[in-house]
């Protein structure tokens, strides 16, 4: 009984800083290994003779794995506990990402990318499941904001520092650059055992599959899919939309502000975490504003277009954090990982499928705006779900 009590005792306030650092670093590696691929893609493609489809798969395949790997993550949490699952997942991610640096052909590159994506996918439900073990109830919202800040900073850092900073340091070698991003994750995985929370994870042998009878599994997942569809979709079709306006010269500015908006969203949530997280009214407002910005991108051009997609990105970032914070706040004890895994399974399946369906329609019609219309249509269908969310804690 004493061991079980120790396993649930949160760290004293003096130790919250190292816990926060570990959460931030783990969050960073939710996105860095995925988003270093786009800036390195031309170098990888030239050396390995990748087709355009395979070059795109360097980024899209790991995103698809975010949905596929949610269930293995939930299973691991139920058998190993959240901390050991997170450490294992980070090791899988680091080894898979490092294997990409050693790939000799397209096949080995795709296998390594899928393996890396599996590790990232297993990390996702492990982080929210770990929060109640490390933090007191009134710190759960802040803990979520911290690791989500790390994740969104990872998007900005991975895309922004790879070419101007790391490539010159490693003699323009994409292989060495990938290793430099990947291997430090093994140190973070080992450091997860430093917080003195007992020597073992408390594990349960209950059902690890999503509880489809719990309406929050689908409701949160489908709204999460709306946020992901908007962010990944607008990002994917940004160049096509600007080219259709004959303003492709604005693409660097558009991408900068689009990605910077996600960082700004994470900083806002660090400040507002306790006041906003778990509040249905905030979620409803963010979902509406996200769709408003998306709709504006269809109607406006030039810098007004950039303002609209930047608004959509900023609000999508807020909505992402608000939704991912819900399982630790509302799930029963021991059910956090299960609910999170179901949300990620649904959310990332939608986030992958809806923009792809929009792209197929845009290819058929020759109008890039039709891709955005598909995302907007899905968002309007998902919006009423925010009105029926039951966010009462179930402990």
Protein language model features and the residues they cover:
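Cytoplasmic membrane-interface "Motif A"-like loop-to-helix N-cap segments
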Residues: 79-89, 274-287
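Cytoplasmic helix-loop-helix junction between adjacent transmembrane helices
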Residues: 112-149
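Helix-breaking motifs and short loop linkers at transmembrane-helix boundaries and internal kinks
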Residues: 49, 81, 102-107, 299-301
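Helix-loop-helix hairpin linking two adjacent transmembrane segments in secondary transporters
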Residues: 142, 146-194
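C-terminal transmembrane helical hairpin of 12-TM major facilitator-type secondary transporters
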Residues: 279-323
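Conserved MFS/SLC helix-loop-helix module at the cytosolic interface between two early adjacent transmembrane helices
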Residues: 68-104
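Extracytoplasmic gate region of multi-pass secondary transporters
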Residues: 38, 216-263
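A late C-terminal transmembrane helix in Major Facilitator Superfamily
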Residues: 330-367, 375
